[in-house]
Amino acid sequence: MNGTEGPFFYVPMVNTSGIVRSPYEYPQYYLVNPAAYAALGAYMFLLILVGFPINFLTLYVTIEHKKLRTPLNYILLNLAVADLFMVFGGFTTTMYTSMHGYFVLGRLGCNIEGFFATLGGEIALWSLVVLAIERWVVVCKPISNFRFGENHAIMGLAFTWIMAMACAAPPLVGWSRYIPEGMQCSCGIDYYTRAEGFNNESFVIYMFICHFSIPLTIVFFCYGRLLCAVKEAAAAQQESETTQRAEREVTRMVIMMVIAFLVCWLPYAGVAWWIFTHQGSEFGPVFMTIPAFFAKSSSIYNPMIYICLNKQFRHCMITTLCCGKNPFEEEEGASTASKTEASSVSSSSVSPA
């Protein structure tokens, strides 16, 4: 039989050798050409090379500049922390195992890598949900006189960690499990088997409902209402130049948010669901590897979209990188003033700021 196997699991996968070996003990070069593992390692190195500096810079700049320490930015910092979890807990491990061609760190290492990668991804996902809810409540005002304060931010942080732990921790204690996936160099939830005693079916269904479908629905609802509010406000002000500019900025921001969310998570979720509903069917190892690494790339998309497109943060970041002096200060100041003029639909009120 073709595939890969380990303690208490067998995953059928297409290969021409007919060899079946444990991904914890032997190189999996019979599944994919060794060059593919080298390419995977190089890709993970690139994610580390980009993901660590941009997320670390986010933390450093926010701590250094007092005006960035706002309640909403607590959530943005949480997003950066989540991405760093993915970089250190997942990317470094995957790069190391890719260099060996199998999950050389064993079952314990698989549990650790799977847990931290899942935890980081879920913290990031639920942080985006909290941001979407905050933007909807503040801009669309379903609750009159609501002001997002420090207590709300702390509750939002606690919520993201609780939801992330509710997804990442159960496989460590027997409700499902972490096993090597794709090219067997990274670990994820067991979508592949119905092994007795692990209740994989119930966990996967729970995860897809509570940790994918619901967040996706919330994000689409909140940003859909956000766009409507911006259009209504622009129309009420007879579409002045500043409000039109704000509307364009917000529209571009929201479109990028939605596209990034779908690019990162929809392919992985779709392939995982297909594997879950077609257990026993053969599939190529690359079939799961490609979408899994699309999801990992969210550690780069998140800070670029949610932070680097924020003019106030960009101003502070440039000031920090240029040793306290911003060579573009005049341009940034004029842009900020323009945004302030369109206060009712300002992108500083719609985009995370």
UniProtKB/Swiss-Prot annotation:
The keyword Lipoprotein applies. CDD domains: 7tmA_MWS_opsin (cd15080). It comes from the Eukaryota. Keywords: Cell projection, Chromophore, Disulfide bond, G-protein coupled receptor, Glycoprotein, Lipoprotein, Membrane, Palmitate, Phosphoprotein, Photoreceptor protein, Receptor, Retinal protein, Sensory transduction, Transducer, Transmembrane, Transmembrane helix, Vision. It holds the Pfam family Rhodopsin_N. It is a multi-pass membrane protein. Residues 62-73, 134-152, 225-252, 309-353 are cytoplasmic. Residues 331-353 are annotated as: Disordered. Its main location: membrane. The modification N6-(retinylidene)lysine is found at residue 296. Glycans are attached at residues 2, 15, 200. A motif ('Ionic lock' involved in activated form stabilization) lies at residues 134-136. This is Rhodopsin. It comes from Sparus aurata (Gilthead sea bream). The gene is rho.
